[in-house]
Each structure stands twice: as structure tokens, then as C-alpha cells.
């Protein structure tokens, strides 16, 4: 994903504009039946990115770039050692952006490598409930994040979950099975998982 640490603001906006145009062309072609494999299939491509939440809670892309996207997954990738209060404020501020719909790998843990950061889960769950924010079940084998005991708490509170593979290569899409298994251990049902819903319902949730 483009970031201000690697690209100038204009370069980022141009990259996302080109991506948006390409996705619009794909969706038009699907609608017109130009793709044989997509015929008779309700299929729609959304324009999204995973965006870093900076230590102050701001997002690591310029606002003009964010406005071109359909929705965001926001995540922590740096400075994991903040106090519980500061980390909680950081995440809640990141989630306040209207395009931010999903918190990615919410605990920040890496199995057998790194403990998760300190976070006030009661405040996060309450914020997600009030603002219709979702939590990711990251299926990458060294993450499995949200863990099952926190999935149970999210499900109790009717907070929607998104099972994502965090794929960086096509073959890693198979990791979805680990996310499904983790969600099941957390007693999640089909209705708790956004990406078990139909295209129309997913669009309604993510694009509003």
C-alpha cells in the first residue's frame, strides 16, 4: 500500500486514482457480461486499502487519497509499546474516520514472536457497537487475530467480524480456512461474519 513515508502526496493520489479507474472499468465489464467467468454471478469489486494508524491516531494517507476509496481497513504496524490509554486513544481516533470500517489484526500479536499491545477492550467494543465498526479475524497463520476469546466477546455484543487472509500472494488465499476455524472457536455464526453475506448486504454495510 502507498504511504507518505515512501511516496509524495501527489504520487499517492495518482496511484489511487488509477486504481479507482481500473476498478470502475472492471465493475462495468462485469455488469455488461464481458467476463465469461463472471456471468450469472453477483460480483462487485470495491476500492479499499489497509491504512496504518499513526501513533497520534491520524491515518498514514492524505485525506484526498482517502476520499477516493470506498472503505478502509485501519491497523497498527508501529510503536506497539504505548500505554493502554494512549494505544486505545490511538485506535479509536483512527476508527473515527468515516471511511474506516474495519480494525485490522486488532491485538497486534504475532504468534510465538510478539505479544499483543495493551488495549482497553471494553472501550473498543463499546465504540464499535455505537459506531458500527467491525473487527478483523486475520487468518494469516502467525496472527489468527482476533483470538477466539475476544471473538466470543465481540459476538456477545453483536459486533460484526470480517475474516481476511492478509494474503500477499495468490496461494495464501487458502489461509481463509484458519480464519474460519478461529471464528468457529469463538462461537461466531454466519450472521456474525460480514463476508458470508450477499453482495448487496456487504455493499450496504461498507459503502454507507
Q: Can you say where each PLM-predicted feature lies in the sequence?
A:
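Charged catalytic cores and adjacent phosphate/nucleic-acid-binding surfaces used
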Residues: 1-44, 55-208
Amino acid at each position: 500500500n502507498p504511504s507518505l513515508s515512501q511516496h509524495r502526496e501527489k504520487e499517492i493520489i495518482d496511484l489511487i486514482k488509477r486504481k479507482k479507474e481500473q476498478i470502475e472499468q472492471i465493475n462495468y465489464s462485469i455488469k455488461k457480461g464481458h467476463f465469461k467467468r463472471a456471468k450469472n454471478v453477483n460480483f462487485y469489486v470495491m476500492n479499499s486499502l489497509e491504512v496504518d494508524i499513526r501513533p497520534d491516531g491520524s491515518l498514514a494517507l492524505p485525506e484526498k487519497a482517502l476520499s477516493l476509496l470506498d472503505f478502509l481497513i485501519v491497523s497498527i504496524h508501529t510503536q506497539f509499546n504505548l500505554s493502554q490509554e494512549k494505544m486505545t486513544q490511538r485506535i479509536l481516533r483512527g476508527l473515527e474516520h468515516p471511511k474506516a470500517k474495519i480494525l485490522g489484526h486488532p491485538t497486534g500479536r504475532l504468534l510465538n514472536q510478539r505479544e499483543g499491545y495493551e488495549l482497553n477492550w471494553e472501550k473498543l467494543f463499546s465504540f464499535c457497537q455505537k459506531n458500527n465498526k467491525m473487527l478483523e479475524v486475520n487468518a494469516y497463520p502467525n496472527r489468527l487475530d482476533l483470538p477466539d476469546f475476544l471473538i466470543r466477546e465481540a459476538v456477545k455484543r453483536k459486533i460484526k467480524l470480517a475474516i481476511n487472509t492478509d494474503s500477499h500472494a495468490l496461494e495464501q488465499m487458502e489461509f481463509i480456512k484458519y480464519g474460519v476455524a478461529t471464528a468457529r472457536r469463538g462461537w461466531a455464526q454466519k450472521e456474525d461474519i460480514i463476508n458470508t453475506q450477499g453482495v448487496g448486504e456487504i455493499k450496504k454495510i461498507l459503502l454507507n
